[in-house]
Amino acid sequence: MRRTLMAICLCLSIAMGWAQTEGRYDKGSVPVVNGRVMLQETIYTTLGQAESYDRISQWAQQRFSKPKVIVSKFTSNDATNHTLSLTAEEYVVFANRFFVLDRTRINYWVEIQCTEQGATIKMTRINYWYEEEREGGLKFSAEEFITDDAAFNKKGKLLKDQGKFRRGTIDLFDNLVEEINNVLTQ
């Protein structure tokens, strides 16, 4: 009886671990605000508003320069309101194996608003250019491809093609948030 109970507990804990691996890509992880996909995160810090803005501005100048991005343009760098916004285009690599490079160009807009409590990062206006080498490739927006309605089948399972774009976009945003968090906690 005791061994059976231990085996059941072990199986349940393993199953729970597997279930949590895809959790950050599940339904609800790509919010749509006013018809646009908008990923948003707030990072809290003990730094002042001006100090946070200065650190993030320096980080952004380095992060959004070549060769890390294809092209970027700062649309607003407002030191008085402590707001930074830019557009960027870079590659998201899905697979990089011998003779196989599966990637897409992602074009997005980022706004970073610094407050006394921390910084809010928003990523929106996301567009993709997939397989650009093949007859011009495919161009589409995040609203057409990675929203809950487009990325999941009727049974609630993440579709293969939409899934890789959804995972790549969420991972890119999470990477930006992690980098900003590291800058603010140094």
Regions found by a protein language model. Name each.
Residues 20-186:
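Ser/Thr-rich, low-complexity intrinsically disordered terminal regions
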